[in-house]
């Protein structure tokens, strides 16, 4: 068997990625989230496939087909809630994975980091178009508001919006194409994941100490397969608690009302995992400015390698930057809270302060802290 897994063209690939892969001996549980994301992706593709077998992408029957899945299909309710809450688990793992990358300086593996940003940027529209499919009130109005943002693009904006809608409003054509996008994008994500892994295994993983670990590597199997298995079991436990006890806790009650173009919900908001970006968008009074800030809030991740002036790898031995990092995380949670609040005082003011702080920490304060730490520790070229 050993000879076969090392010589067979296909098994050799799996062997080099998951069995004999040299891995730093000291990576902590924060490194588990990559494999958890892989499990989440598999769960989403499988549950999504079974949902697609019973779903109809037509404005007159979409809402009813989702109700039919929950009421009449064998374990349809389970598949539907696994898919809906699986998306939330996906984004929780994604945020932790990116947060770990920032904390431990993984952004210095440029190719892996940039593919990761592309993965994040592909996952966001996938989740957005998926949220539109049940064709509830929040699905319809969320689609209307978010797609309308493209009209802020000078000259081609309005044409672009109508082109995406397939008409003069969000209607049957929009729903059909969103279903098509939602079906194809996870497979594009899977392809990007393979590229992400390919680049990661070119350089090897980082580790908590931030030092070169080439002299101290252990095989991935059995050490990290067992460790990842524990993570997977914990993830599945949390997911099943969500699905079986609190299936609607992360959703919006408005989405249990069929879409009605004549009745606008009191507060239009996206799913919870987009609220931080939505808060940044709303905090700028100008439409185009808001859209640019929204895009930059994600693309700013690409600036981390450029803005890094520290002579140390990661934040483990950098208390000033560590302090700023945790302020950044707290600020992100505040933005998430603000995104779900109505547009009124004091929420607008808190949102504006948090949005400024979000960019200021990354662009100004963290590089400044790095320079101060370099000086204190006399780390010069």
From Swiss-Prot:
Keywords: Electron transport, Heme, Iron, Membrane, Metal-binding, Mitochondrion, Mitochondrion inner membrane, Respiratory chain, Transmembrane, Transmembrane helix, Transport, Ubiquinone. PANTHER family: CYTOCHROME B (PTHR19271:SF16). Its cofactor is heme b. It holds the Pfam family Cytochrom_B_C. InterPro entries: Cyt_b/b6_C, Cyt_b/b6_C_sf, Cyt_b/b6_N, Cytb/b6-like_sf, Cytochrome_b, Cytochrome_b_C_euk/bac, Cytochrome_b_N_euk/bac, Di-haem_cyt_TM. This is Cytochrome b. GO terms for cellular component: mitochondrial inner membrane; respiratory chain complex III. GO terms for molecular function: metal ion binding; ubiquinol-cytochrome-c reductase activity. The chain crosses the membrane at residues 33-53, 77-98, 113-133, 178-198, 226-246, 288-308, 320-340, 347-367. Belongs to the cytochrome b family. Heme 1 (or BL or b562) is low-potential and absorbs at about 562 nm, and heme 2 (or BH or b566) is high-potential and absorbs at about 566 nm. It is found in: Mitochondrion inner membrane. One of its GO terms (biological process) is mitochondrial electron transport, ubiquinol to cytochrome c. It comes from Thomasomys daphne (Daphne's oldfield mouse). It is a multi-pass membrane protein. Heme b b566 binds at residues 97, 196. Component of the ubiquinol-cytochrome c reductase complex (complex III or cytochrome b-c1 complex) that is part of the mitochondrial respiratory chain. The b-c1 complex mediates electron transfer from ubiquinol to cytochrome c. Contributes to the generation of a proton gradient across the mitochondrial membrane that is then used for ATP synthesis. Gene3D superfamilies: Cytochrome Bc1 Complex, Chain C. The cytochrome bc1 complex contains 11 subunits: 3 respiratory subunits (MT-CYB, CYC1 and UQCRFS1), 2 core proteins (UQCRC1 and UQCRC2) and 6 low-molecular weight proteins (UQCRH/QCR6, UQCRB/QCR7, UQCRQ/QCR8, UQCR10/QCR9, UQCR11/QCR10 and a cleavage product of UQCRFS1). This cytochrome bc1 complex then forms a dimer. Heme b b562 binds at residues 83, 182. Its main location: mitochondrion.
């Amino acid at each position: 068997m050993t000879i076969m897994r090392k010589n067979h063209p296909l098994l050799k690939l799996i062997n080099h990625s998951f069995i004999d892969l040299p891995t730093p001996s000291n990576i902590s549980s924060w490194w588990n989230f990559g494999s958890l994301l892989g499990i989440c992706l598999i769960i989403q593709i499988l549950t999504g496939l079974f949902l697609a077998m019973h779903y109809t992408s037509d404005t007159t029957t979409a809402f009813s087909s989702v109700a039919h899945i929950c009421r009449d299909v064998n374990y349809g309710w389970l598949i539907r809630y696994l898919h809906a809450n699986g998306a939330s688990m996906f984004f929780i793992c994604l945020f932790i994975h990116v947060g770990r990358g920032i904390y431990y300086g993984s952004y210095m593996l440029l190719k892996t980091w940039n593919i990761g940003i592309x993965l994040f940027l592909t996952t966001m529209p996938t989740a957005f178009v998926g949220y539109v499919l049940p064709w509830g009130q929040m699905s319809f109005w969320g689609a209307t508001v978010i797609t309308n943002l493209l009209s802020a693009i000078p000259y081609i904006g309005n044409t672009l919006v109508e082109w995406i809608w397939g008409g003069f409003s969000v209607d049957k054509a929009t729903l059909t194409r969103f279903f098509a996008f939602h079906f194809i994008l996870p497979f594009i994500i899977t392809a990007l994941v393979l590229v992400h892994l390919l680049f990661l295994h070119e350089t090897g993983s980082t580790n908590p100490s931030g030092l070169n670990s080439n002299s101290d590597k252990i095989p991935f199997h059995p050490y990290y397969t067992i460790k990842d298995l524990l993570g997977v079991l914990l993830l599945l436990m949390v997911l099943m608690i969500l699905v079986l006890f609190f299936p609607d806790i992360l959703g919006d009650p408005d989405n249990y009302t069929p879409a009605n173009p004549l009745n606008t919900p009191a507060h239009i908001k996206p799913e919870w995992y987009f609220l931080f970006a939505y808060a940044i968008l709303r905090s700028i009074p100008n439409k185009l400015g808001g859209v640019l800030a929204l895009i930059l809030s994600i693309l700013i991740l690409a600036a981390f390698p450029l803005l890094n002036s520290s002579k140390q790898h990661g934040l483990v031995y950098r208390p000033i930057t560590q302090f700023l990092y945790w302020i950044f995380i707290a600020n992100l949670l505040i933005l998430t809270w603000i995104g779900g609040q109505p547009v009124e005082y004091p929420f607008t003011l808190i949102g504006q302060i948090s949005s400024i702080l979000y960019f200021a920490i990354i662009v100004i304060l963290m590089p400044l802290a790095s320079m101060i730490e370099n000086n204190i520790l006399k780390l010069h070229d």
